[in-house]
């Protein structure tokens, strides 16, 4: 399974083409992923780039949770899959970000790629800089989460 890690800056050209960072490109090529799926994130103003296999797994999980005989579920599924672009890297390792995505996300020239487990987020640099907690707040939040996990695990063992 592919795991993307890191936070890498890049530049998009006037046409919206951007080089996928080398470390991510190597991982994609080692997994023989030639097709990538791009969509706007459901919650944030960034793009999410999925290897095709990961996209298919996420789509299968969503499909399993939805009832195809429920009109609202059909609407949700349709919206989720319709706002997608199938992307391929060119021979130089670049992808083209569609104009509508550039506008929605505020991406101009400075781009930030963030590896988030099995997918890659693509952010306008100035928006990405506002994403992260201050180190002390991050440490405290992580400590609290891990305490809760340990309490839950310890209670299950009793």
Curated annotation (Swiss-Prot):
Gene Ontology cellular component list: cytoplasm; nucleoid
Domain of life according to the entry: Bacteria
UniProt keyword Nucleus present: no
Subcellular location: Cytoplasm, Nucleoid
Predominant place of localization: cytoplasm
SS bond partners: none
BP terms from Gene Ontology: negative regulation of DNA-templated transcription initiation
SpoVT-AbrB domain: residues covered: 7-54, 84-127
Protein keywords: Cytoplasm, DNA-binding, Repeat, Transcription, Transcription regulation
A molecular function (GO) term: DNA-binding transcription factor activity
Family: Belongs to the MraZ family.
UniProt subunit comment: Forms oligomers.
PANTHER family for the chain: TRANSCRIPTIONAL REGULATOR MRAZ
Entry protein name: Transcriptional regulator MraZ
Organism of derivation: Bacteroides fragilis (strain ATCC 25285 / DSM 2151 / CCUG 4856 / JCM 11019 / LMG 10263 / NCTC 9343 / Onslow / VPI 2553 / EN-2)
Lineage: Bacteria, Pseudomonadati, Bacteroidota, Bacteroidia, Bacteroidales
Gene name as annotated: mraZ
